């Protein structure tokens, strides 16, 4: 086993990487509230795992979406647990994200030289809210349907571009299959990809600049 480790160590310098990670200085003022960002990340990873598991059974059509969710909850092995964990961690992710934003703002973590870290964090907060909006519609029950209809109808109040924007969101003049397809694509592909990209920008900046000091 040591020979295998030595082989990788010679090529990747694993020990140097581990030393860099474990030797990072942590300021003495750091408390449990500085863990909110990490908890949000953990919730996101749980979302990815449980969401991926549900894609094996979920059918993104207006005629089968609700019945496929019922199948997950009543027939699929541990489906009820997987979907419940997905819902609980979604709520927890939104809550932790909100608390994390407040903590950073109240402790001045957005100030120079951490402006870009703050900007990427705000983008991640918007993406988190977008996960909630798109995921809420996927069961395609009465609550999901009317939530989508209301949310996609909001831009209609914007002069000139309002109506085209509504049609872009819905995929047609009214809420239907095109809308569900778009929301499913956003929820399972576009938003996770964008979130991963901005996380890969957010975390190295935190790593480079360190945790902000006390006020």
Curated annotation (Swiss-Prot):
UniProt-annotated binding residues for heme b 2: 86, 187
Keywords, sorted A to Z: Chloroplast, Electron transport, Heme, Iron, Membrane, Metal-binding, Photosynthesis, Plastid, Thylakoid, Transmembrane, Transmembrane helix, Transport
Topological type in the membrane: Multi-pass membrane protein
InterPro entries listed in its UniProt record: Cyt_b/b6_N, Cyt_B6_PetB, Cytb/b6-like_sf, Cytochrome_b_N_euk/bac, Di-haem_cyt_TM
GO molecular function: electron transporter, transferring electrons within cytochrome b6/f complex of photosystem II activity; metal ion binding; oxidoreductase activity
Details of cofactor binding: Binds 2 heme b groups non-covalently with two histidine residues as axial ligands.
Signal sequence segment: none
Annotated binding of heme b 1, by residue: 100, 202
GO cellular component: chloroplast thylakoid membrane
A Pfam short name: Cytochrome_B
Keyword hit for Electron transport: yes
Additional remarks: Heme 1 (or BH or b566) is high-potential and absorbs at about 566 nm, and heme 2 (or BL or b562) is low-potential and absorbs at about 562 nm.
Protein family per UniProt: Belongs to the cytochrome b family. PetB subfamily.
Stated role: Component of the cytochrome b6-f complex, which mediates electron transfer between photosystem II (PSII) and photosystem I (PSI), cyclic electron flow around PSI, and state transitions.
Oligomer and partners: The 4 large subunits of the cytochrome b6-f complex are cytochrome b6, subunit IV (17 kDa polypeptide, PetD), cytochrome f and the Rieske protein, while the 4 small subunits are PetG, PetL, PetM and PetN. The complex functions as a dimer.
HAMAP family: Cytb6_f_cytb6
Stated name of the protein: Cytochrome b6
């Amino acid at each position: 086993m040591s020979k295998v480790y030595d082989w990788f160590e010679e090529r990747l310098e694993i020990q140097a990487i581990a030393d860099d990670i474990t030797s990072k200085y942590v300021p003495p003022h750091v408390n449990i509230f500085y863990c909110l960002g990490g908890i949000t990340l953990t919730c996101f990873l749980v979302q990815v795992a449980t969401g991926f598991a549900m894609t094996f059974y979920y059918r993104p059509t207006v005629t089968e979406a609700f019945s496929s969710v019922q199948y997950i909850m009543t027939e699929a092995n541990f489906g009820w647990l997987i979907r419940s964990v997905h819902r609980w961690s979604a709520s927890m992710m939104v809550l932790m994200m909100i608390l994390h934003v407040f903590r950073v703002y109240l402790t001045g973590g957005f100030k120079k030289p951490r402006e870009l870290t703050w900007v990427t964090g705000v983008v991640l907060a918007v993406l988190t809210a977008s996960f909630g909006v798109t995921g809420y519609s996927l069961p395609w029950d009465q609550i999901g349907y009317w939530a989508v209809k209301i949310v996609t109808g909001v831009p209609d109040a914007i002069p000139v571009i309002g109506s085209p924007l509504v049609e872009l969101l819905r995929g047609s003049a009214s809420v239907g299959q095109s809308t569900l397809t778009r929301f499913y694509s956003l929820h399972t592909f576009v938003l996770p990809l964008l979130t991963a990209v901005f996380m890969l920008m957010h975390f190295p900046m935190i790593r480079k600049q360190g945790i902000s000091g006390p006020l």
